[in-house]
């Protein structure tokens, strides 16, 4: 079954061609164009010819007065033609650079200059063949769907027919665009045209939309060259005269000069260099070093010679060979800086911290005795009793009074926190373990205990039996500033008590018979207190080196001596 079309009414209707040209122009510019086409594609001429297409009915699904659905086989070989106008880029290097990233191209200057020329293309000798699904309804118009690519061939005539390369390129590109047009855009165009012919509501709404568009577009256009800037320059930065500005217009040439104000250029340059970064949105934050400043010269300018309190620790950690002892050095330096009683300078605390770190490293491998025996070598029973209390003795030999030599404390100064200033003192401290040697000022609380005991003993020498009761009432409390209290106490006892208590204040050989009982009781109490405190520090979890200083931060007083 076949049909014969009356093609003459379509050829006679002028409004149909006008509307079809507008729809084709919008459809050709909607799809992404190749980079060689630098302007919009305009349909200047459209003619459907005098030869109608041939339709063969393959299937009819629905047939009524106001609706129809069927599948057809269409073939067309006629004299229809279509004329297009656009502008193309004649320099292929410019097109190549536009489609490649800037960091991957050599960025030529003269060779990449754009050259645009007008182009007129005429499409004729269409040959179409394909299967079409046609659905007709007076309420919804005509819907046409191509099940395959209907374009077989066409003829492309252009301005560059004399150049074979350009002719073949245009033929290939236009064929690709027309295949997309037939599959996607042409069914939409036919549907809109059918709605305009058979649906009055759609026609009225379209006319109202066109009227609103024309009203908005009325009035003279604004010329950006009417009010040029005060100091205009061209794209190369050359200043322009008033005569040159007056000669410029929007339609004077293909490429209009870009006018920029010199003040705006300076502002853009300052904005580009903002915060010494390439980001235009870098916030302005005071006293902040950006990553673009992290060069040796910029780092020196930013610091200004001021070192933070923790900078010596960083310098010390980087200046030695990495190992397990680095952690001991850092801990000793941090403890010496945080325990300083006055606001000393950073470099002085750094020097003292280095000395403390060397002592802790030298005594790291020598751990022999954990108990310092301060008793007199008089009887054996006393030694047995003290060694029974202590749990830190690590030797298997019989308890001896002289087994642990007394350390020669050579850093007897008024400042209880000051560590040794030179590495010579490490020869005099061989038996102090490293876990208790990290904070050297631990000897000062022991010296204060001995001083208090001597003073209490001197005041109550006639009543040696009531030592425990008096000691409970006179227990020294930990003050908020323990270092200042220790300093005043040491100055008060400077004339009465000797300075080197661990080795000289206790009379061992030339003591008088009248004070032998008092000295013996004092030594026993002092040794028991030291052993008990060291035992508590060993059993306390965490860092045992700083347990004594951690107890100073509590408000509770230490327990009474002898308990």
UniProtKB/Swiss-Prot annotation:
Listed GO MF terms: lipid binding
Keyword line: Lipid transport, Lipid-binding, Membrane, Mitochondrion, Mitochondrion outer membrane, Transmembrane, Transmembrane beta strand, Transport
Record's bilayer topology term: Multi-pass membrane protein
Feature: compositional bias, Basic and acidic residues: 371-381
BP GO annotations: mitochondrial genome maintenance; mitochondrion-endoplasmic reticulum membrane tethering; phospholipid transport
Keyword NADP: no
GO cellular component: ERMES complex
UniProt entry tagged with the keyword Transport: yes
Transmembrane segment boundaries: none
Domain SMP-LTD: 1-195
Region (Disordered): 212-237, 336-399, 411-431, 488-517, 537-563
Disulfide bonds, paired cysteine numbers: none
Biased composition annotated in UniProt, kind: Polar residues: 336-351, 387-399
Compartments it resides in: Mitochondrion outer membrane
Basic residues bias spans: 358-370
Oligomer status and interactors: Component of the ER-mitochondria encounter structure (ERMES) or MDM complex, composed of mmm1, mdm10, mdm12 and mdm34.
Entry-linked PANTHER family: MITOCHONDRIAL DISTRIBUTION AND MORPHOLOGY PROTEIN 34
Family: Belongs to the MDM34 family.
Known role: Component of the ERMES/MDM complex, which serves as a molecular tether to connect the endoplasmic reticulum (ER) and mitochondria. Components of this complex are involved in the control of mitochondrial shape and protein biogenesis, and function in nonvesicular lipid trafficking between the ER and mitochondria. Mdm34 is required for the interaction of the ER-resident membrane protein mmm1 and the outer mitochondrial membrane-resident beta-barrel protein mdm10.
Domain comment quoted from the record: Lacks alpha-helical transmembrane segments, suggesting that it resides in the membrane via beta-sheet conformations similar to those predicted for other outer membrane proteins and porin. The SMP-LTD domain is a barrel-like domain that can bind various types of glycerophospholipids in its interior and mediate their transfer between two adjacent bilayers.
Name of the protein in its database record: Mitochondrial distribution and morphology protein 34
Gene: mdm34
């Amino acid at each position: 079954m076949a049909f014969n079309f009356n093609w003459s009414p379509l050829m006679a209707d002028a409004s149909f061609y006008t509307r079809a040209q507008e729809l084709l122009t919008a459809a050709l510019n909607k799809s992404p164009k190749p980079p060689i086409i630098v302007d919009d594609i305009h349909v200047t001429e459209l003619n459907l010819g005098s030869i109608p297409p041939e339709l063969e009915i393959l299937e009819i699904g629905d047939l009524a007065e106001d609706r129809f659905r069927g599948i057809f086989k269409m073939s067309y070989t006629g004299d229809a033609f279509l004329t297009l106008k656009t502008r193309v880029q004649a320099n292929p290097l410019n097109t190549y650079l536009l489609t490649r990233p800037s960091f991957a191209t050599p960025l030529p200057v003269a060779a990449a200059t754009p050259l645009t020329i007008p182009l007129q293309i005429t499409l004729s000798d269409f040959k179409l063949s394909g299967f079409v699904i046609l659905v007709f309804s007076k309420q919804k118009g005509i819907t046409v769907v191509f099940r395959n690519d209907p374009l077989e061939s066409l003829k492309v005539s252009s301005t560059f027919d004399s150049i074979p390369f350009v002719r073949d390129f245009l033929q290939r590109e236009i064929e690709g665009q027309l295949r997309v047009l037939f599959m996607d855009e042409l069914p939409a165009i036919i549907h809109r045209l059918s709605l305009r012919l058979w649906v009055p509501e759609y026609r009225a709404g379209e006319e109202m939309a066109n009227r609103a568009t024309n009203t908005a577009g009325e009035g003279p256009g604004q010329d950006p060259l009417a009010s040029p800037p005060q100091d205009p320059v061209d794209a190369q930065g050359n200043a322009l005269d008033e005569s040159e500005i007056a000669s410029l217009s929007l339609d004077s040439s293909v490429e209009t000069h870009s006018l920029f104000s010199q003040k705006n250029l300076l502002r853009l340059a300052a904005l580009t260099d903002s915060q010494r970064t390439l980001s235009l949105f870098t916030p302005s934050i005071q006293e902040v070093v950006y990553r673009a400043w992290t060069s040796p010269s910029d780092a020196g300018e930013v610091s200004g010679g001021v070192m933070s309190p923790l900078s010596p620790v960083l310098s010390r950690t980087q200046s030695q060979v990495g190992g397990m002892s680095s952690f001991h050095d850092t801990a000793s330096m941090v403890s010496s800086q945080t325990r300083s009683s006055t606001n000393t300078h950073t470099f002085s605390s750094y020097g003292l911290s280095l000395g403390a770190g060397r002592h802790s490293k030298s005594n790291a491998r020598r751990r022999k005795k954990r108990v310092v025996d301060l008793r007199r070598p008089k009887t054996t029973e006393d030694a047995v009793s003290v060694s029974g209390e202590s749990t830190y003795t690590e030797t298997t030999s019989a308890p001896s009074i002289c087994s642990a030599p007394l350390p020669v404390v050579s850093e007897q100064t008024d400042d209880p926190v000051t560590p040794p200033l030179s590495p010579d003192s490490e020869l005099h401290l061989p038996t102090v373990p490293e876990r208790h040697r990290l904070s050297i000022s631990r000897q000062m609380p022991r010296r204060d205990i001995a001083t208090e005991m001597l003073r209490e003993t001197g005041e109550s020498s006639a009543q040696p039996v009531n030592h425990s009761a008096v000691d409970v009432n006179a227990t020294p409390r930990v003050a908020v500033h323990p270092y200042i209290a220790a300093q005043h106490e040491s100055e008060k006892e400077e004339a009465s008590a000797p300075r080197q208590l661990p080795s000289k204040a206790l009379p061992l050989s030339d003591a008088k018979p009248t004070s032998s009982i008092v000295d013996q009781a004092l030594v026993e109490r002092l040794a028991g207190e030291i052993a008990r405190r060291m035992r508590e520090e060993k059993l306390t979890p965490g860092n045992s080196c700083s347990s004594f200083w951690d107890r100073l931060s509590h408000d509770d007083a230490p327990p009474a001596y002898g308990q």
